[in-house]
Regions:
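Phosphate-binding site recognition
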Residues: 1-435, 450-451, 471
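Conserved catalytic cores of phosphodiester-cleaving nucleases, focusing on short active-site segments
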Residues: 443, 466-483, 497
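C-terminal amphipathic alpha-helical interaction region
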Residues: 459-461, 468-472, 503
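A short acidic/basic microdomain associated with nuclease active sites
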Residues: 446-461
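Mg2+/Mn2+-dependent nuclease catalytic core
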Residues: 166-179, 483-500
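Metal-dependent nuclease catalytic cores in nucleic-acid-processing enzymes
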Residues: 184-191, 344-352, 441-449, 493-513
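Structural motif
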Residues: 143, 475-477, 511
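Domain-level recognition of nuclease-like catalytic cores that cleave nucleotide substrates
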Residues: 502, 506-530
Length: 530
């Protein structure tokens, strides 16, 4: 099987004999039931391929769709004028880049259709004029497809890049790009009667930055149950298209076919984009894993978006204060250019996803989607938060290996050494509430990374919960941590709260570990096992 890794052109996939997961039934539904759409999905999730497929569909290239669902659904196969703008691949941190790109696109289209341009008009006005001209000349309404509509904004989000406009005014490029896009998108309102179909894709839905205020509000299908699987790969699609490839991967890795399916699911599945909660696999990582026949962090290795790194560096919110909570959609769907509210950007960038839906309150539980994101994203955050030379993921590997050998002494030494390596400037907290917050967040980061290697939970008991319970094939480890307390206090709590009771019938030995953490030294100062 040939995997279309890095190929986003539908025609190239078909002509090259690459595997294609058929999404054309959803595309047909989209083009027959609506007119102007917006779709938000994380990077490398198939948005560009979706746009490309629509381009060839509206181009009337029926032969490319032989054997696909849409071949039987579509009867007409009409050809429409298609205007495709792809903002991928351009750097919009320079003041003139966006305007120049739009000017070049419109000028090329004017030449293509034999229309004389008018430099006195804005680029949005010229585009609206062009759409009307092409509609009248061809007798066909126009199709506009814009891929990564928000990249000119994300490139300069939360920066102070500046430029001088034509009137000599000194402007932030973020503001300039926003105004330029607003003016360009206003063409859609002026040309409504000339439009057959419009799709804008991107990572982020900008709410109060006025990008969409200039034209008819698009139908946002980002959380639509009908379109939740329009990008990405479902479990049914994985089994139906890649069954033999998963078996071959299992053979290569020396595990059973069922084990390889569980590995793929834990590492790349877990995305949900609607209240229906259909499991969606990350397509980029999944295809890479099947091609290479190995489990690696393919999506995360392509890099965390710079805009998200900037945003996180400027916020005081810790991830443990954002995850595991129920939210109204207004809290995580619309980004309002507020660095104090990073949740929408983290969610829309693919680092958090929907894990549950509460119908009574119409709210959504958000958390990390899968092990790839847990390990990569939390390691990145831990590096910035703790400032250690050794990564938190390296520590997690050491802790995992120690517990699998039932070696608590090495476990303690590794954890103690890691805490000792945290610079004083990173852990210095003056207020008691700050000390508590630092203590809880540090352990949250370490143990959630550890959970990608071992069965690790914060077990809810009727009497309360242990700080952490780790299960290995040969043992159960119940940890209780105290800040500026004693290890005896921690062990006493384990007994009094009955944290070990669920394991009374377990054949594995149960280890109770009390740990005291010193806010003064920033490391472990008392440790006892029972």
């Amino acid at each position: 099987m040939k995997y279309p890794i890095g190929i986003q052109d539908f025609k190239s996939i078909v002509d090259g004999g690459f595997v294609y997961v058929d999404k054309t039934a959803l595309l047909h539904k989209m083009v027959t039931e609506g007119k102007i759409y917006f779709l938000s999905r994380p990077r490398r999730f198939g948005k560009s391929l979706l746009v490309s497929t629509l381009k060839y569909y509206f181009g009337g290239e029926r032969e490319l769709f032989r054997g696909l669902a849409i071949e039987d659904l579509e009867q007409e196969w009409e050809q429409y004028p298609v205007f495709h703008i792809d903002f991928n691949g351009s750097d919009f941190t320079q003041g003139s880049t966006l305007q120049n790109k739009l000017d070049v696109c419109v000028e090329d289209w004017e030449r293509q259709y034999g229309m004389t341009g008018d430099d006195r008009l804005s680029v949005g006005e010229r585009f609206a004029r062009l759409l009307a001209f092409v509609h009248k000349r061809t007798g066909k309404q126009c199709v506009v497809l814009i891929d990564e509509y928000d990249k000119p904004l994300l490139d300069v989000l939360d920066t102070d890049y500046r430029t001088t406009d034509g009137n000599g005014n000194n402007l932030r490029i973020e503001e300039l790009n926003r105004n330029t896009l607003k003016g360009f998108y206003s063409a859609f309102k002026a040309a409504d009667q000339d439009l057959r179909f419009v799709l804008l894709t991107g990572v982020t839905k900008f709410s109060q930055v006025s990008v969409f205020s200039g034209f008819n509000q698009p139908e946002d299908i980002s959380m639509s149950a009908a379109y939740e699987a329009v990008c990405g790969i479902t479990e049914a699609e994985l089994e139906g298209t890649f069954h033999d490839e998963m078996d071959a991967m299992a053979y290569e890795m020396g595990v059973s076919p069922e084990e390889v399916r569980q590995l793929l699911k834990r590492h790349y599945d877990g995305y949900h984009f609607s209240k229906r909660k259909t499991d969606i696999f990350n397509p980029f990582s999944l295809l890479n894993a099947l091609s290479v026949k190995d489990i690696q962090d393919y999506w995360f290795r392509t890099g965390t978006p710079s805009y998200l790194v900037r945003l996180l560096s400027h916020t005081d919110e810790n991830l443990n204060e954002l995850t595991g909570k129920y939210y109204d959609t207004s809290d995580f769907i619309d980004y309002r250019a507020d660095v104090e509210r990073p949740l929408p950007m983290i969610y829309q960038s693919g680092y958090l996803t929907i894990k549950d839906y509460d119908r009574f309150s119409n709210s959504y539980l958000l958390d990390l989607p899968n092990n790839e994101v847990k390990k990569g994203f939390l390691t990145l955050i831990a590096s910035n938060y703790l400032g250690t030379k050794e990564s938190a993921n390296t520590l997690a590997i050491q802790l995992t290996r120690a517990l699998l050998r039932d070696d608590l002494d090495t476990w303690r030494k590794s954890l103690t050494a890691f805490f000792a390596s945290i610079p004083y400037s990173m852990r210095r907290k003056d207020m008691e509430t700050e000390k508590e917050r630092y203590f809880h967040y540090t352990f949250y980061l370490i143990f959630r990374i550890l959970s990608t290697y071992l069965v690790l939970t914060e077990k809810q008991q009727s009497e309360g919960r242990a700080d952490c319970i780790v299960e290995t094939p040969t043992g159960v480890y119940i940890f209780e941590f105290k800040l500026d307390g004693t290890a005896d206090d921690a062990l006493r709590q384990i007994e009094e709260k009955g944290y070990a009771r669920p394991y009374e019938a377990d054949s594995r030995p149960v280890h109770r570990v009390g740990v005291s953490f010193s806010s003064r030294t920033g490391t472990i100062d008392d440790w006892k096992e029972a």
